[in-house]
Amino acid sequence: MDLDNIEGLNEVRLAVYRAALKLRSLQKLCQMNLVLLQDLRPILNTLWSSGESTISLAQEDVQQHLEELFRSISPELPDQAVTEATDQTTRLLFKLFDRGQTGVILLRSVEAALIALCGDTLSAKQRALFRLAESYSGNQESDRGSISRSALRVLLEDLSQVPAVVQENHVFGHAETAVSSCFNGVISAGVTEEHFIWWLQSEPRLLLWLSTLYRISVSEAVQHRVHCHACKAFPITGLRYRCLKCLNVHLCQSCFLTERRSRKHKPSHSVLEYCTQPSWKESMASLASSARHALVPRHTRREAERKRALRAGSSAELRYSASNPALQFAAYADTHDAAAEASQTAAPAAVTVESKSLQTEEIQIPQRETAELQKDISVTQKAMRDLQRDKWLLEKEFQVWRVAAQSEHDSLEDKCSELKSMMETLNQHNQHLEEELDTVRHLLSLRHKEELKTSHSNLQLEQDGSINENNWTQPGLLKPHESSSTEHEVEERGTRQERRFEEEEDTLYDLSEDISTNLDDSESILPQDVHTALAQREEEELQEEEEGLHEKEEGLPTEEEELQHDRQDPSFFHGCMSDFAPDGHSDDSEMDDEEDLCELVQRLRNELSLYTASGSVCLQKEMLMTAAEGVRDSVSHLVTSVKSSSLA
């Protein structure tokens, strides 16, 4: 019996109509719309044979009597439909009144629910409810025809459980409030049937669903030959609503209950509800009233409203006396205008009689004041509705603005976090590059020191070798074994030095590859403009290197080539020898010449070794320093580009 998803009933904005529509669907499901009060009386009389109001019924008894009821109302109804209706109604009654799951319910509660959900007229239901409450009172013979407070409270508590089955009981208030409103102004211990019927016709809040359910059931098959102003449906089936503010504007039941807006009509306008198709006289009177309301000047309109207020006050009791359902329409937002329309359609003769009283000045003055007060109240209510609508629109706009601002704030926070992470990554790369640069500088300094030590040791070895050669040139001092061992040690030292140079070159090559890899990683996270700047920088450096190489190829030979050429040229040696050769050739100075020649050879070897060692060291140092400067320039350019892009 979950009615939340039936026919989209939760889309109905007005809680009273939403509850009534759900109860109407439940009524059709249980086939109670086919049951009349005359069909209920034999079954109820059988159950009330004991005369006690606290009779408890088990589920089997209730199901048995309900099956007899449904078989009696429609003999041609299939057995399957009878069984289904019996089961649905039994489950409904026990869901309403057996909250503790005891397995039994009271007879009075069953009778109240069946009377409220049957398909009889509203006046017949009201009289049946009065007789049921009268049976609760247990009055003496002299008190027949009235009900007490306790009896009315019990009846209203049972009836208040009916909308609870569709989760709408929170809308209609409490039973004690309804009892107080019924006994308001009553000095006796009970109320009569006339007063009770009048109170029910005034539609107390607790029983609003009862009259609304009846109007919906009456108007289901009614077709109104007018167009809906909102959805353009023709004809309008069901309840029809005519706007009292807009001229010739009609709404169907669906558009009104969902508060559908249109270009001219607003949900805040006062409307009249029609259950059945009105006659042509009623239509003409309604059209004239709308035209007068829209076209008559302000002072004439005020006079017309005053007269209509007088007519409404005089014909308040005649609104519910007509048995024709066409006269049972009520105002939704403006009670006084609805009463005026009802009085015009119900008793036009009474209007003529009451209009004669306007000739009396003594009655006219208080009535005019009453009409003005009523008009002020209606204007105030309209202003309050407009303010509430403006408040609702402002709240909607504020919600939209807050969502937009929140989304923008979130996007900015995401961008800020991305920039922060990028800056942290770049700082880490920069620190890593600086560490590698320091490592390169340290290795260069160590290598320079090693080269200085090596050159110094080579110089010392050469000097030792020159001494050995001098000793070798002297007669009687030749030591072949010592000279060969010295040469062997020199070769081993040279080999170790070359291996150390190769290891250091491999280390420098690995460091350069790490630097290039880090630069590539850092370039992958840079923006497009930084990549472009670095590419341009690399192209310029490559062009400069190519131009330098081209100039070196076309220019003069390098120092190494000149040195190699001088070494290979015998004239260089002979020139040097000629500088130190003696002018005379005597036999006495033959030993001196030989010693001078050895010294010259030793000096030449020392000079050549120093020149070669210093030249190679200077060349390698220059190459490493050039590479280090290039790395430094690239790192500084990278950091500058990142800072400029982050600031932009």
Swiss-Prot record:
Residue ranges that the Swiss-Prot or TrEMBL entry lists as coiled coil: 367-446
Write down the InterPro entries for this protein, in alphabetical order: EF-hand-dom_pair, EF-hand_dom_typ1, EF-hand_dom_typ2, KCMF1/Dystrophin, Znf_ZZ, Znf_ZZ_sf
A molecular function (GO) held by this record is: zinc ion binding
Which residues are noted in the entry as Zn(2+) 2-binding? C243, C246, H265, H269
Residue numbers binding Zn(2+) 1: C228, C231, C252, C255
Stretches for region Disordered: 455-509, 536-557
UniProt feature, compositional bias: Polar residues: 455-474
Record flagged with keyword Kinase: no
Keyword Zinc-finger attached: yes
Q: Biased-composition ranges for Basic and acidic residues?
A: 479-502
Q: Where in the cell is it found?
A: Cell membrane
UniProt GO cellular component terms:
plasma membrane; synapse
Query: A single GO BP annotation from the record?
Result: synaptic signaling
Query: Which keywords appear in this protein's UniProt record, sorted alphabetically?
Result: Cell membrane, Coiled coil, Membrane, Metal-binding, Zinc, Zinc-finger
Pfam entry (one)? EF-hand_3
Q: Where are the zinc fingers (ZZ-type)?
A: 223-279
Domain of life of the source = Eukaryota
Instruction: Give the compositionally biased regions (Acidic residues).
Output: 538-548
The protein here is known as: Dystrotelin
Q: Which organism is it from?
A: Danio rerio (Zebrafish)
